[in-house]
Amino acid sequence: MSKFNRIHLVVLDSVGIGAAPDANNFVNAGVPDGASDTLGHISKTVGLNVPNMAKIGLGNIPRETPLKTVAAESNPTGYATKLEEVSLGKDTMTGHWEIMGLNITEPFDTFWNGFPEEILTKIEEFSGRKVIRETNKPYSGTAVIYDFGPRQMETGELIIYTSADPVLQIAAHEDIIPLDELYRICEYARSITLERPALLGRIIARPYVGEPGNFTRTANRRDLAVSPFSPTVLDKLNEAGIDTYAVGKINDIFNGAGINHDMGHNKSNSHGIDTLLKTMGLAEFEKGFSFTNLVDFDALYGHRRNAHGYRDCLHEFDERLPEIIAAMRENDLLLITADHGNDPTYAGTDHTREYIPLLAYSPAFKGNGLIPVGHFADISATVADNFGVETAMIGESFLDKLV
């Protein structure tokens, strides 16, 4: 018999809580990640007011320096800790896959100097469109459309760029390159990047609208991932007949593997929370697992190094957290975590190698406190333990700590 009938896992994309022990092995614009601290630096530089997460225990998570504006609770309503990543990567897919029990020992390919000419030529031949060679490098997604969007509007050329992550991104103005065509080109790019020397984690369609100087990326983003190389706990749940619900880009990240209810993409964090609430309210969702990703922290503010916007985004989530708690049933468990860091005060524009926070809350809790510091995959091990299925590759359950 399951301890909790339903578990809801919410990933606050990129909300790290301090540099991981191996952070100096990872860099941003040539600067090691060893001094990165997403929540710590936001709290210190622009202030952070998240009383609802604080009540569960966010300020109680052990740190060398306590969060400046998030106090520890003497009697929190839940459990808290921080988790370390063991996989060799700091990208979204690696983080989520490890959360679901995989250890990625061979990282995907990254292209600091741009993609090989062979890749670009194949895409040109397939699409019938030229590729702007000047964008073929790690580039900020907002900067690349600012710099080359006007040219694309004139010529119809493709904007292809990458980042420190193993991704190939194609930006296209929706009035110039229709969504169906963009998605078709991305599907082709996915088909030619499934093995080395160009094994990529994701192909990302990045549509945008607007006029030169005032371009805006739309919610029609599409991620084309590869399937996990080994069964995750999602697969184990699915095989056991336990419902799995995906909210936001979760279905894309796992390429649909182990997910039997895709609730769709999010237009924003607020829309994602609305979808989660709708999912939690489904009469047929009596037992199972929901998995939500809220990406605005990362996509809108982390990469753009906008600490004020990031803080406000955290405030907005915290203000809606009581709605999520109110939608819980007596034997539900809520887990709030992240997948990597993206310190908006740090060098560069890419992710930072950090611990992730973990907050656990249930109306059924009679106790509270700290869970021992562990690893990302402990989350999936706990989910597996609760529902009586096998774990994946790694992870240790903390289910017995939740009382």
Swiss-Prot record:
Record-linked Gene3D superfamilies: Alkaline Phosphatase, subunit A, Phosphopentomutase
GO biological process annotation, one example: nucleotide metabolic process
Record-annotated disulphide pairs: none
Reaction(s) catalysed by this chain's protein: 2-deoxy-alpha-D-ribose 1-phosphate = 2-deoxy-D-ribose 5-phosphate; alpha-D-ribose 1-phosphate = D-ribose 5-phosphate
Keyword vocabulary terms for this entry: Cytoplasm, Isomerase, Manganese, Metal-binding, Phosphoprotein
An example molecular function term from Gene Ontology annotations: manganese ion binding
GO cellular component terms, A-Z: cytosol
Cofactor binding annotation: Binds 2 manganese ions.
EC number: 5.4.2.7
Cofactors required: Mn(2+)
Pathway(s) where this gene product acts: Carbohydrate degradation; 2-deoxy-D-ribose 1-phosphate degradation; D-glyceraldehyde 3-phosphate and acetaldehyde from 2-deoxy-alpha-D-ribose 1-phosphate: step 1/2
Residues the entry annotates as binding Mn(2+) 1: D13, D339, H340
Top enzyme category: isomerase
PTM description: Phosphorylated.
Residues that hold Mn(2+) 2 according to the record: D298, H303, H351
Family, as annotated: Belongs to the phosphopentomutase family.
Entries under HAMAP family matching the protein: Phosphopentomut
Functional note: Isomerase that catalyzes the conversion of deoxy-ribose 1-phosphate (dRib-1-P) and ribose 1-phosphate (Rib-1-P) to deoxy-ribose 5-phosphate (dRib-5-P) and ribose 5-phosphate (Rib-5-P), respectively.
NCBIfam families in UniProt: deoB, PRK05362.1
Protein name as annotated: Phosphopentomutase
Record organism: Streptococcus pneumoniae (strain ATCC BAA-255 / R6)
Gene from which this protein is expressed: deoB
